[in-house]
Amino acid sequence: MRQLLTVGLVLTITLIAFSALAVETILPLVSDDLGGVSLYGWVFSAFFLGSLASVIVAGGIADRRGTLLPYSVGLSLFALGLLIAGAAPSMPVVVAGRLVQGVGSGAILASTYASIARGYTEAQRPRIFAIISTAWVLPAIVGPAAAAFIAQAFGWRTVFFAVLPFAVLAAALAVPALRRLGAPAHPGEGASRRDAVLVAAGGGLLLAGLSNPNVVVAIALLVAGGAIGVPALRRVTPPGTLAGRGGLGAAVLVRGLITFAFFGTEAFLPLMLREARGLAPTLAGLVLTTGGVSWTSGSWVHERLAPRLTSRTIITTAFALIAIGACGVLAVLLTPIPWEVAYLAWAVSGAGIGFGYAAISVLVLRLAPAGRTGATGAAMQVLDNLGTAFGTGVGGAAVAIAVGRGLAVETGIAAAFVIAIVGAVVGLTVARRLDASRPSVIAEAGTMSAPSLVIDG
């Protein structure tokens, strides 16, 4: 049963990984075809706002009723989102498809964390996390180039449709294993569906406010978003999360900050290389390959070094590497240095997030209260998704504002990179509050290098 479950989960994460890298690669082509560069950031943000709501609901359902239902519904919605985005006649419809896809991805990821916690013993978890981390290797190596080739040869819509058969295969493998896993022996309470919707709605209002050119409307949206989203976010995350207090709260918060910094830069890399340096989609997309491969390498380095390092050292080092890489990418945009430097710089950032993301992932699971593994994993994914949504959304707002004021797209991209670098510095500061009294024991629970979904899905 465990072998079937492992294969099914790995294939599912592989689908999310390929989709994430493919969308980042082909989005400049989609924007050229449909217009709507002002919605560039929303293509990513909508995905993660949808995931925000579903990951909370699915985590609670997994704790109460088992992982089969949230996984099955999540995979179905993920496939539906692919269909909507692939058939979209306009950029707003692409955004809508990505929203549906994100709802599905959130449910899948919450189910995955709960399945690992319940389907494997503590001694087996190092192995399963390491195996799942490899689900990003093949998409990272071939995904961007394959997506660019398919888009140029058959059209960008085919990239979305090509993922669908593999979703059916993943369901055929994972569903029987999840059915055998059954419901948990000691169900937890789960999180409020109302809070899940409020967090996503508040996040959407905040992002809409940041990108609205009308000052009065922008302020109204920001105030409403904060009033709706912040109290709900406090209720669905561990105590002390928003304040970054030590222990579980700080660990969950740095998860959001690390995705803010990393994906707030990565989402605009292909666009930057195309607009500023004139690279073809295939070459521009390859920068994502360097980041993806180095991400996985960083997670394996973490596994080797973690017994000799403290959690504080691991995670602060990760933020430092991400900041260094982002500064290198910014230098490629602002100076005439060779564009190949962007590939090297992004490899540094990829190694950084692999090193730190793995530590945060399993640290949160280890600190989760009994009977709350699904909800705690969901809380981590909430901050993961919120960080990515705001990293890409704020960057997208910078691009939209620049274009709206008649400035070059490159000006908005530069602002997006600077914002992401600031996020990395803040993350480094919060990570210094983590326990530094003893060597990290995170390695005892294994590693995980897969983004949230995304990574970006």
Where are the regions a protein language model picked out?
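Membrane-helix boundary and inter-helical linker elements of multi-pass secondary transporters
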Residues: D32-D33, D63-R64, G86-P89, R118-T121, ...
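Helix-loop-helix hairpins in multi-pass membrane proteins, especially solute transporters
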Residues: T25, F48, L52, A58-E189, ...
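Intrinsic disorder in cytosolic terminal tails and internal cytosolic loops
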Residues: M1-R2, A183-A185, R432-G457
